[in-house]
A protein has these predicted regions:
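Extracytoplasmic low-complexity, Pro/Thr/Ser/Ala/Gly-rich segments
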Residues: 29-87, 91
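A short, structured loop/turn motif at beta-sheet edges
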Residues: 64-69, 98-102, 155-156
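Terminal, regulation- and interaction-focused segments at domain boundaries
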Residues: 80-108
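Bacterial signal peptide processing site
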Residues: 23-25
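Bacterial N-terminal signal peptides that target proteins for export
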Residues: 1-10
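Extracytosolic low-complexity repeat regions of secreted or lipid-anchored proteins
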Residues: 92, 102-166
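C-terminal motif of bacterial Sec signal peptides marking the signal peptidase cleavage site
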Residues: 18-21
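Juxtamembrane and targeting peptides
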Residues: 16, 27-28
């Protein structure tokens, strides 16, 4: 023998259905990862949008390249530099590379010796590089050449290339 549902059960079920209808369903993150974005980010005054389609052009501005085999490449605008320097613009290029190509890159573009990267003391002055979050970077070495600041994390793998400019 079955009994019809009581009014209390029906009311509770109706309330649960209404609450579920008012609660947004979980969604995927609304912001795509920088390498997935289809809309380039154009910083005022910058010669190119901060996107992978313009990577070679951006690297040419700094008269540099990335280490051979670099992967997981992202480009973001250097907005903190732009805020602190009237008319300034810049790009932060983040990437991963194997140790030997990083050493070769250091040898080619800086005064440091790539073979000695592990023996250099950790860089501790980050005041001039506000567009890179150093809180999760272990044992950084910072070096510069021209318009470029290069941050290398040890053990070798993660790197950041900051290219900045301004009107003349």
């Amino acid at each position: 023998m079955t009994h019809p549902p009581s009014r209390a059960i029906l009311a509770a079920a109706a309330i649960v259905m209404m609450l579920n209808a008012c609660t947004p369903a979980p969604t995927e993150p609304t912001s795509p990862a920088p390498e997935e974005t289809s809309m380039p980010i154009q910083q005022e005054g910058a010669p190119y949008p901060a996107d992978l389609d313009h990577l070679d052009d951006i690297l040419t501005l700094g008269k540099t390249t990335l280490p051979e085999g670099a992967t997981t490449i992202t480009i973001t605008p250097a907005t903190k530099f732009a805020e602190s320097y009237p008319g300034g613009w810049g790009y932060v290029i983040t990437y991963h590379a194997d140790p030997q190509p990083i050493r070769n890159h250091i040898d080619t573009y800086t005064d440091l010796k790539g073979e000695n990267l592990e023996s250099y003391p950790d860089s501790t002055t980050f005041l001039h590089i506000k567009d890179i979050d150093f809180s999760s970077i272990h044992h950084p070495v910072i070096t510069g050449f021209g318009k470029v600041q290069l941050v290398v994390e040890r053990p070798l793998g993660r790197c950041w290339l900051l290219i900045r400019g301004a009107p003349r």
